[in-house]
Amino acid sequence: MELITKEESKTNYEYGCDPYNRPIGELLKNGIVVIDKPSGPTSHEVSAWVRDILKLKLAGHGGTLDPKVTGVLPVALENTSKCISVWHMIPKEYVCLMHLHRDTEEEELLKIFKKFTGRIFQRPPLKAAVKRSLRIRKIYELELLEKDGRDVLFRVRCQSGTYIRTLAEDMGEALGTSAHMQELRRIVSGPFTEKDIVYLQDLTDAYIFWKENGDETELRKIIKPMEYGLQHINKIIVKDSAVDAICHGANVYLNGVSKLSKGIGADETVLIETLKGEAIGIGTALLNTKNVLKESKNEEDNREKYKEPIVDIERIFMSPNTYPKMWKKKK
């Protein structure tokens, strides 16, 4: 992600911390564990097991997987649960084993894959926990991996909220027959991939080893900082002097900005970070990158507009007083 410097600024290492060097106690409360969800338990049960293994008060999952579905399940630990809403709308990727109910040529199958790539209509299945109204979902990629008789293995990258079971059934109908999903595995969920996953037993062993031997090496390999799960979002990096004000609920103003992502659009959700890379919170950008830089050049000529916020803060991750107070209350 390319960053543009608005104003060079240095950070003071007497407060705050590089996210990847947080003390293990802080990491446990501001971290993410990406579990390889087994077939059988619900996503909620897996999250509860992670919470209990790590002796935490709270753990929540991002992107529910049905009990029989396996694969990438990001679990947010305590304070990181505030990030879950950001994960809900990110694209997902699956590998699905579909069984067709009649013989089909590979060429015919590829034509259907092409037809179902792009915007499609879906109605949630009967067992879905949402209203069964017709909705539009986007299929970004459909790739045939293997075909053995009537069994078809394919990879799909899709918009969040896409029902793969329904997709398989609809493709079968388009082929002039019927089809059903036999197995499903999630391999990507936004920034999380199969390279990040661990088994519940590995997590248990690493935690026990830390508690009994004081060695946190393996536990650190498993628990990722909160910021790892926010790397897909465009960001605005603020000066140390602006951090505590934002932690107390202030919006982001132009004079507090040091750097920002190149491609920020107006009304886009953006991450607010410190110069050390710590997540402060998220908000809605009120100006795009081009206009932020334009306002910076004109700040002397346009003081009134300069006083307007450029980001409307929606959710704060960082605790107040992590950085010293460097702001004054209006009289």
Curated annotation (Swiss-Prot):
EC code: 5.4.99.25
Alphabetically, which GO biological process terms does the record hold?
box H/ACA sno(s)RNA 3'-end processing; mRNA pseudouridine synthesis; rRNA pseudouridine synthesis; snRNA pseudouridine synthesis; tRNA pseudouridine synthesis
Q: Which GO terms describe its molecular function?
A: RNA binding; tRNA pseudouridine(55) synthase activity
Give me the reactions it catalyses: uridine(55) in tRNA = pseudouridine(55) in tRNA
Which PROSITE patterns is this protein grouped with?
Answer: PUA (PS50890)
What Pfam families does this protein map onto?
Answer: DKCLD (PF08068), PUA (PF01472), TruB_C_2 (PF16198), TruB_N (PF01509)
Record's InterPro entries? Dyskerin-like, PsdUridine_synth_cat_dom_sf, PsdUridine_synth_N, PUA, PUA-like_sf, PUA_sf, tRNA_PsdUridine_synth_B_fam, TruB_arch
Where is the PUA domain positioned along the sequence? 233-307
Q: Which UniProt keywords apply?
A: Isomerase, tRNA processing
Keyword Ribosomal protein assigned: no
**Active-site residues, Swiss-Prot/TrEMBL:** 66 (nucleophile)
Q: Which domain of life is it from?
A: Archaea
- Annotated function: Could be responsible for synthesis of pseudouridine from uracil-55 in the psi GC loop of transfer RNAs.
Please state which protein family the record places this protein in.
Belongs to the pseudouridine synthase TruB family. Type 2 subfamily.
Q: What is this protein called?
A: Probable tRNA pseudouridine synthase B
- Tell me the organism: Methanococcus aeolicus (strain ATCC BAA-1280 / DSM 17508 / OCM 812 / Nankai-3)
Q: Which gene encodes it?
A: truB
